[in-house]
Each structure stands twice: as structure tokens, then as C-alpha cells.
Amino acid sequence: MFESLSERLSGVFDRLTKQGALSEDDVKTALREVRVALLEADVSLSVARDFIKAVQDKATGQTVTKSVTPGQQVVKIVHDELVYFLAGEEDPEKLKIDNPPAPILMVGLQGSGKTTTSAKLANRFKQKDGKKVLMASLDVNRPAAMEQLQILGSQIGVDTLPIVKGEDPLAIAKRAKTQASLGGYDIYILDTAGRLHIDQELIAQAAAVRDVANPRETLLVVDGLTGQDAVNVATEFDDKIGVTGVVLTRMDGDGRGLSLIHISEPTRRRGISYAVF
């Protein structure tokens, strides 16, 4: 993913003149090509525009360090700004998993990787933090969704809530809460159902589960190949449900995996952290 963007950016700065300070024309020439490279990588126009403006403001008029050329100076500024867009200035806060049992609600569209991510997250809590974790599938719509989580749980040695046919998502959430308390679990993860697109039924169901579980964290799982629509998905879920974090999956895909650039700055402005799986 990032290798493809790197290839697009290679050679962008060849035309910069060798002078002591960077003029606006020098910067504009290089950044015009950077913007094209971002747009070709499916980065949205608004995000590319904000990125270029931030770089231009920092680059124009800067005195070039003696040991580097103006082109190298601009490359460094672009690099630093790209790092900021992806990571921000501060380290992301740790997930709130104190005061057990701590509920974590997993939401997102169908096919984004919620179930697999739930298992990865549970395994991380178990292996790195020594936590006792319970997973529960609330997806009563997708065939074999509950069985999938059950299989993943057995593979990583994490307990899953026993399947009771005919239960609705709210009943499952309540049973998971009770089981987590009685079983001495540190964390319980609720894997909700997804849809191919955001609709009122999906949002209403997730909101109802949220009200029952009162989760410490509500994590939105987004497919890294979503591209420009990633921001719309994150905004919709945050407005209707309240999202505390975003998990991006399949980040080893093609150029559209640059959803990370799309989503990092808008979500950071909303106070939402994100992680990559």
C-alpha cells in the first residue's frame, strides 16, 4: 500500500532549483505533483488539499540546511506532515479495560473484519495483558457468524458465550454481561452484526446493545480497502452510536488501503483514536 504511494512520489522533487531558500513557485511545482500522487492513490480531494496546504505553509520561506538541497528539505517536510496525518502528535490512549468486567462493543459494516478483529483483540489482551476474556457473537443474521467466533475462540484459547438459538442480540448482550460477571472475566467483547451498507436497522440495533452493555470502548472496524468512503462510515457511526476508536483492517492491500490517510485526520478532530490490524 504505502510502497505504491512511495513509487508515485519518487522523482516528484527533481525540478526544485538549488537555492538557499524555497520560493512559493518551487514549493507549488513539487506539491502539485504530490497532490496528483495522492489523488491517484484514491485519497479524497479534501484530504489531499488539507495535506498540501499544511506542507506549503511549513515549506515556504524556510531556510535550507547547509547539508541538504531544497528538494531534500521539502521531502522531509512532506514526510513529517504525512507522519503527523497518520499518527498525530501524541501516542493514542490505551483502551479502557479497568474495573472488570470491561465491555467492548465491536461495530462496523459487513465484511469489514469485525469477527476476526474481535478474536485478534481478545488474543492480544490474553497474551500481552494476561486478561481473562469472553467473546460473544450478537450476529443472528449472517449464517454461521456465531460458529465462526466460536471456532476462532477455540483456536486462540479464549472463551466464547455458548450459542442459544433463537435469542435476539439484546438477550445475548445481557447474558454475556451476566456470564462475564459471574465467571470472573476481565473483559468481554460483543461482536455485533453488520450490513452491506449503513441503515436504520443496523444503527438502531447497535445503539440498543450499547445502551444495555454500557461499553467502555466502542470500536468501529473499517475495511482498509474502503477508500474515500471510510470517513463517511466513521462519521455516521460516531454520530449515531458514539465511537471511541477505529480499527483499520486489510492495510496490506492496494492503493485504496490509504483509508488510513482519509480517516486519521477527521477522526482525530473528533477525539477518536485508531489502530491498524
What spans do the regions from the language model cover?
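Active-site/ligand-binding-proximal alpha/beta "capping" segment
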Residues: 210, 230-248
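Short, ordered loop/turn segments at secondary-structure junctions
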Residues: 138-141, 164-168, 192-195, 223-226, ...
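Conserved beta-strand/loop subsegment of P-loop NTPase cores
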Residues: 134, 188-190, 215-222, 241-252, ...
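Primarily NTPase-proximal linker/entry elements flanking Walker-type ATP/GTP-binding cores
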Residues: 5-138, 145-192
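Inter-motif core of Ras-like GTPase G domains
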Residues: 203-224
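Single conserved hydrophobic/aromatic residue that forms the stacking wall/gate
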Residues: 261-277
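GTPase G-domain guanine-specificity segment
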Residues: 201, 233-235, 239, 251-260, ...
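Conserved ATPase-coupling elements of RecA-like P-loop NTPase cores
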Residues: 145-146, 197-203, 230-232, 257
